Amino acid sequence: MMESVIRLENFYFAYNKSELVLQDIDLEIKKGSFTVVAGPSGAGKTTLCKAMTGIVPFYMGGRYSGDVQVLGESTKGRRVSDIAMRVGLMLEDYESQLVSLTAGEEVAFSLLNHGFAPEEVAERTRKALEDVGLPGRESYQLDELSGGQRQRLLLAATLAVHPEIIVLDEPVSAMDPDGAHSLYELLYAIHQRYGTTIIVVEHRVDYLLPYVCLLYTSPSPRDM
């Protein structure tokens, strides 16, 4: 039996002075699975992604009850930066996560912040860009890349840290159907090659049917 890497138990969450965004969530993600979470707009899927990485509630604030466990430990009292070394996150608003001028600097940013040696940073950056189909783009300015390429760049920055889990919130929102299929083929190849646990929030489930192990759907907002 596969072990759990993420578990939400009786989890409720509301942003400050707002109604409940997540209500009575019980969810278990197995190690090495490729899991899809689907549901309508307003169902709390983005907030769920943030809860899986400790951003909600411990970075953004809000009211909550219940528990979230990541890799066998509760997120309570853990630093978001420590969780980020093991759980990568790509949000739908990917532009807000891009912080550098060039593709190489973007991939290297979190590695340098975590104290990796320059030689290892350079090698991980090269390999991550190659893995996402952007080989040799280290010196490219971000404004030279298309929206889809910038989403691939953010995936490269996530992969470079070698996370055990990757959580992706609508990662193909800036892509045409061909680009979306290509990115999900890439994600599945990474999942197969490295055994990475993949969790994708996506309203177009048809993109993912060839790859998914587990599918969770939400019929109405906040009823996850």
Ranges and model annotations:
Residues 141-145, 149:
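Conserved ABC ATPase signature
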Residues 202-203:
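H-loop/switch region of ABC-family ATPase nucleotide-binding domains
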Residues 119-137:
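Conserved ABC ATPase "signature" region
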Residues 61-73:
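Conserved ABC transporter NBD signature motif
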Residues 166-169:
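Catalytic Walker B motif of ABC-type/P-loop ATPase nucleotide-binding domains
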Residues 216-224:
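Single conserved hydrophobic/aromatic residue that forms the stacking wall/gate
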Residues 162:
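Conserved catalytic motifs of ABC-family nucleotide-binding domains
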